[in-house]
């Protein structure tokens, strides 16, 4: 018996040490929802942010939803109050490759969990048109909160099985040393974005980057259905929903169109109105307004907010500022079911004129 106990100790102790190391290193931060460590590995923000809001139900009543691009809508340009005078506290639920279908699931989970929401902004783009819900436990960055709900034990075990990323340990200790002076962590918990997403500078002009790849739009992602479901849910819950499209850099925009992006925009207009910032304008033809081939800079996001939330003079100035000699659809034009055919035809004409130059 004594030998058996000794053997078990030799087995159990190393396993416990290894499990403890996995929990400590925790590259994707699923064990550190209340104390994220901002390393060079992308955390599982879908899970972290959803759990954070459920643990702090009264802290935020207004959310931004979408892919990583929506991180570049600055907090200072958002409405401070509802139409009837209630204060709005905004949190950005942005995460890499966030899809409309996942966003709907997130909102439903939050409402069911007792989070009171008054306003939502959802940004749709060329990722939305093909990206559906991430299923299963195979991708630690993208595993959803809903997968966790199905089986918390399986969820956490899937992360314990991952080999610890030892190279980030110095970064973790650096984070701990910052303590209360960690501005990145404060920003994450107050608005859900990275420090880079507050940089209001315009970049350097240069050559047009190679396009960001997109996949073909065939309706399989369920994006349009999810947008419709979200719209109906918001009506039921008396939540103001604002749908907005991303301004997409010219090279990436052309590839998106070749994969059916304009069809997606038309289909989306059949289920909800939205502000259109995709198209040819001052920003989408200027690489200096983008961090890369995918992400517009916050300075563009602020102009978008002026169009959506500014008074008439501010809005008109922002629209005029974005206009160039190829623009046929104004920056932030409100697309509806009734005008969608004309808008899509103008977008097609824009891109055809651009290609002839």
Question: Across the structure, where does each feature detected by a protein language model lie?
Answer:
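Short extracytoplasmic
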Residues: 41-66
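Secreted/periplasmic serine-hydrolase-like ester/acetyl group-modifying domain
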Residues: 123-124, 133-237, 321-357
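N-terminal post-signal-peptidase region of extra-cytosolic proteins
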Residues: 43-50, 100-108, 225
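Flexible, glycine-rich surface segments
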Residues: 201-286
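Alpha-helical transmembrane signal-anchor/signal-peptide segments
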Residues: 25-48
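C-terminal regions of proteins
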Residues: 257-357
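Membrane-embedded segments
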Residues: 69-155
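Hydrophobic membrane-insertion alpha-helices, especially the h-region
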Residues: 6-26
């Amino acid at each position: 018996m004594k030998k058996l106990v000794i053997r078990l100790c030799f087995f159990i102790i190393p396993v416990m040490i290894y499990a403890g190391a996995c929990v400590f290193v925790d590259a994707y931060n699923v064990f550190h929802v209340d104390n994220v460590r901002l390393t060079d590995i992308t955390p599982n923000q879908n899970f972290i942010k959803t759990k954070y809001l459920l643990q702090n139900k009264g802290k935020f009543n207004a959310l931004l939803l979408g892919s990583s691009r929506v991180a570049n809508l600055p907090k200072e340009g958002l409405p401070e109050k509802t139409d009837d005078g209630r204060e709005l506290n905004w949190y950005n639920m942005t995460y890499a490759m966030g899809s409309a279908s996942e966003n709907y699931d997130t909102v439903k989970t939050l409402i069911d969990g007792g989070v009171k929401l008054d306003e939502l902004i959802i940004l749709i783009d060329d990722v939305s048109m093909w990206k559906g819900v991430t299923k299963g436990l195979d991708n630690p960055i993208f595993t959803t909160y809903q997968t966790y709900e199905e089986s918390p034990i399986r969820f956490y075990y899937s992360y314990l099985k991952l080999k610890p990323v030892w190279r980030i340990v110095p970064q973790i200790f650096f984070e701990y040393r910052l303590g209360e002076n960690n501005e990145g962590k404060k920003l994450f918990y107050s608005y859900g974005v990275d420090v880079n997403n507050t940089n209001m500078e315009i970049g350097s002009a240069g050559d047009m980057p190679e396009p960001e790849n997109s996949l073909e739009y065939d309706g399989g992602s369920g994006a349009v259905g999810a947008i419709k479901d979200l719209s109906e849910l918001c009506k039921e819950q008396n939540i103001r929903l604002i749908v907005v499209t991303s301004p997409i850099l010219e090279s990436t925009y052309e590839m998106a169109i070749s994969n059916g992006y304009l069809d997606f925009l038309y289909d989306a207009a059949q289920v909800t109105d939205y502000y259109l910032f995709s198209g040819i304008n001052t920003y989408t033809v200027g690489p200096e307004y983008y961090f890369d081939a995918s992400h517009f800079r916050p300075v563009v996001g602020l102009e978008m907010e002026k169009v959506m939330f500014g008074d008439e003079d501010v809005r008109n100035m922002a629209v005029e500022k974005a206009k160039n000699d190829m623009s046929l659809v104004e920056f932030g034009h409100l697309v509806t079911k009734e005008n969608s055919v004309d808008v899509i035809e103008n977008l097609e004409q824009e891109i055809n004129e651009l290609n002839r130059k």
